[in-house]
């Protein structure tokens, strides 16, 4: 689409093709020290999981060594990782939380 001004200048509107943001999955990693109930609490508080879903993810972390908490744009995933790590440290647990590009 072109816009012509009185002074003769012509502005051309250039179509922008926006791609969706890169998505990242947030993972909890298993360790031998963090209580299972604390992992369930983290999943409920920071990932809005109901108790049953949080328990299923916690069991996956325990059984498989890691569990997916959710998939988010980079900034949100990064913030969630930081919040979980800070909460775990303050509670004295070595729980690890990481993000991976999907």
Swiss-Prot record:
Alphabetical GO biological process terms: protein catabolic process; proteolysis
Record's Pfam families? ClpS
Record-linked SUPFAM superfamilies? ClpS-like
Checking InterPro entries in the record gives: ClpS, ClpS_core, Ribosomal_bL12_C/ClpS-like
- Out of the domains of life, which is the source? Bacteria
Record's family? Belongs to the ClpS family.
Oligomer status and interactors: Binds to the N-terminal domain of the chaperone ClpA.
Question: Per its record, how is this protein called by name?
Answer: ATP-dependent Clp protease adapter protein ClpS
Q: Which organism is it from?
A: Janthinobacterium sp. (strain Marseille) (Minibacterium massiliensis)
Q: What is the lineage of its organism?
A: Bacteria, Pseudomonadati, Pseudomonadota, Betaproteobacteria, Burkholderiales
């Amino acid at each position: 689409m072109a816009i012509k001004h009185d002074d003769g200048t012509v502005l051309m509107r250039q179509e922008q093709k926006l791609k969706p943001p890169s998505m990242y999955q947030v993972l909890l990693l298993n360790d031998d020290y963090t209580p299972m109930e604390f992992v369930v609490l983290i999943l409920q508080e920071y990932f809005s999981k109901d108790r049953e879903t949080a328990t299923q993810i916690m069991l996956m972390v325990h059984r498989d060594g890691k569990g997916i908490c959710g998939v988010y744009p980079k900034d949100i995933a990064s913030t969630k990782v930081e919040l979980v790590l800070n909460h775990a440290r303050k509670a004295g647990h070595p729980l690890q939380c990481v993000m991976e590009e999907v």
